[in-house]
C-alpha cells in the first residue's frame, strides 16, 4: 500500500528513510506548538484552544501535502504572520482576533482562487526580486523587535522610544542563554535545536523564573473557544483592505518560495512533470482557510522541511510522519501552557536572524532596486506594521522607476499594488 501511495522505489527511498526524515523535519519545526499559542495568546486568544488548533492544522496541512501532492514538505502556522496578526492587527490596530481570523479566511479564499486559475505564478513573476527579499528581511526585523521586547531585553522609554531592559533579571538572563544554546546547537547540526532551546529555558524557569509545573500529559483541551469563531463581516469592511492584502502577499511569496526551494533541493522539479508541484500549491492554499476555521493565523509550507529532505525524504510519507507526530503533541498541552514568553523569545530572535540573510540577494549598486527594498524592510519594525512596510516599499519602487525613466522595468503588477496602497492611504487612511 505504501508503494502504491508514495511510489518509494521510483523515488529511490525506503520506509525507514522516510520515517527518519519525517522525525527530523518534525524536530526542527515542533517549536511552533509553543510559540504560536504564546504569540496569539498575547492577542487575547485562549492559549489552550490555539495550541489544539496549531497541532490540528499542522497535522491536517502536512497530511494533505503528503497524501495529495506526495511531497516531503510539512505545514504549520507561519512565523511572521502570526506576529502581524497579534501585535499589529489586534493590539496595534484595535481589531478583534475574530475579525483577524476573518481576514485570514478571506486571504485564504483569494489564495485558493489564484492557485486554481493558475495566476499564482503570474503574480509572483510580477513582483521584483528585490522587494521579495526585502519582505523577508522586514518580517525578520519585525520578529526581532518582538522577541527582544518579549524577553525584556528591550523596553519602552519616553525619551528614546526604546532602551535596554534589566540585564540582571532572571527572564533576560535565561532568554540570552537560550539564544546562545540554540545558535550553538544549530551550528553543531543538532536536530531540533530551536525546540531544545525552548524546552531548556522552560525547565530552567521552574527553578529560577518562578514558573510552576502542572504536569506533562493530559487529554487535549477543547478547541471550541476558537473553532469557527471568525468574523468575516468585519473583515470585509474597508479598514481591512490592507490587512487582507498583507496576509495574501506574504502567504504568496513565503509559501511559493518554500515549496519550490525545498522541492528543488529534493530533485522533484522535473520539467514536464510539474503536476505534483501544482498539487502542492493547491494543498497549501487549502490549509490557510482551514486554519482560520480552526482558530489560528495563516498556515504555510515550512522551510524546515529541507532538514527532512537532507535526511533522505523524497515522498509524502515524510510529511505524513510529521502529521502523525503533531497529532501526538495534542496530549502535551500542560507543557505548552507553562512555556513563558522569554522561553519562546530566543526562538523568535533566532528565526529573525536567519531571515536577514536575504539581504545578500539585493543589488546594492542599483539604487532603484536597493532603496525601495531598504524602505520596505525598515518601515516594518519602525511602524510596527508589515502592511506599512509593503505599502511604502511598492510605492517607493514605482516612484523610483518612474522618475528615473525606467518605467518599463516595473511589471504592471507593481503599479497595481502601489495604486491599491495609495488608494488606501489617501481615501481610507493610514495605520
Question: Model-derived features: where do they sit?
Answer:
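Helix-loop-helix junctions within the multi-pass membrane cores of secondary transporters/permeases
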Residues: 2-36, 57, 78-136, 264-359
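Hydrophobic/aromatic residues within the transmembrane alpha-helices of Major Facilitator Superfamily
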Residues: 23-30, 60-63, 67, 148, ...
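Membrane-embedded alpha-helical modules
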Residues: 93-207, 320-431
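Loop-to-helix transition at the N-terminal end of transmembrane alpha-helices
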Residues: 44-60
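Helix-loop-helix hairpins and the membrane-proximal interhelical loops
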Residues: 1-49, 162-164, 195-278, 422-423
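Residue-level signature of catalytic and energy-coupling elements of molecular machines
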Residues: 19, 39, 123, 192, ...
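Juxtamembrane transmembrane-helix boundary signature
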Residues: 58-79, 110
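Membrane-interface helix caps of multi-pass small-molecule transporters
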Residues: 38, 63, 67, 88, ...
Amino acid at each position: 500500500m505504501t508503494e502504491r501511495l508514495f511510489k518509494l522505489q521510483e523515488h529511490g527511498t525506503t520506509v525507514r528513510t522516510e520515517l527518519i526524515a519525517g522525525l527530523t523535519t518534525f524536530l526542527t519545526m515542533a517549536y511552533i506548538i509553543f510559540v504560536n499559542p504564546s504569540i496569539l495568546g498575547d492577542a487575547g486568544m485562549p492559549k489552550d484552544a490555539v495550541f489544539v488548533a496549531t497541532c490540528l492544522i499542522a497535522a491536517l496541512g502536512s497530511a494533505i501535502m503528503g497524501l495529495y501532492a506526495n511531497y516531503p514538505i510539512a505545514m504549520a502556522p507561519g512565523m511572521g504572520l502570526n506576529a502581524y496578526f497579534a501585535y499589529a492587527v489586534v493590539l496595534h490596530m484595535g481589531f478583534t482576533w475574530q475579525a483577524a481570523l476573518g481576514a485570514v479566511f478571506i486571504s485564504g479564499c483569494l489564495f485558493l482562487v489564484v492557485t486554481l486559475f493558475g495566476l499564482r505564478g503570474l503574480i509572483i513573476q510580477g513582483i521584483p526580486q528585490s522587494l521579495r527579499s526585502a519582505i523577508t528581511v522586514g518580517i525578520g526585523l519585525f520578529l526581532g523587535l518582538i522577541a527582544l521586547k518579549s524577553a525584556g531585553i528591550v523596553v519602552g522609554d519616553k525619551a528614546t522610544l526604546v532602551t535596554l531592559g534589566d540585564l540582571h533579571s532572571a527572564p533576560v538572563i535565561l532568554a540570552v542563554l537560550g539564544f546562545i544554546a540554540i545558535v550553538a546547537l544549530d551550528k553543531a547540526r543538532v536536530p531540533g535545536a530551536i525546540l531544545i532551546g525552548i524546552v531548556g529555558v522552560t525547565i530552567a524557569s521552574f527553578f529560577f523564573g518562578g514558573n510552576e509545573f502542572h504536569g506533562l500529559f493530559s487529554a487535549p483541551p477543547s478547541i471550541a473557544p476558537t473553532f469557527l469563531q471568525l468574523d468575516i463581516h468585519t473583515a470585509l469592511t474597508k479598514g481591512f483592505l490592507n490587512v487582507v492584502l498583507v496576509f495574501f502577499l506574504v502567504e504568496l511569496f513565503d509559501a511559493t518560495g518554500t515549496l519550490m526551494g525545498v522541492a528543488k533541493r529534493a530533485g522533484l522539479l522535473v520539467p514536464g512533470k510539474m503536476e505534483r508541484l501544482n498539487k502542492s500549491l493547491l494543498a497549501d492554499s487549502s490549509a490557510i482557510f482551514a486554519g482560520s476555521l480552526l482558530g489560528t493565523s495563516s498556515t504555510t509550507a515550512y522551510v524546515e522541511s529541507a532538514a527532512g529532505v537532507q535526511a533522505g525524504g523524497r515522498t509524502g510519507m515524510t510529511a505524513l510522519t510529521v502529521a502523525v507526530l503533531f497529532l501526538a503533541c495534542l496530549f502535551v498541552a500542560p507543557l505548552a501552557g507553562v512555556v513563558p514568553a522569554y522561553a519562546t523569545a530566543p526562538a523568535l530572535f533566532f528565526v529573525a536572524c536567519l531571515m536577514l540573510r536575504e539581504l545578500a540577494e539585493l543589488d546594492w549598486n542599483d539604487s532603484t532596486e536597493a532603496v525601495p527594498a531598504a524602505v520596505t524592510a525598515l518601515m516594518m519594525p519602525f511602524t510596527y506594521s508589515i502592511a506599512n512596510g509593503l505599502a511604502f516599499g511598492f510605492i517607493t519602487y514605482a516612484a523610483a522607476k518612474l522618475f528615473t525613466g525606467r518605467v518599463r522595468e516595473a511589471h504592471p503588477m507593481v503599479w497595481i499594488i502601489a495604486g491599491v496602497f495609495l488608494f488606501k492611504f489617501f481615501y481610507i487612511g493610514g495605520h
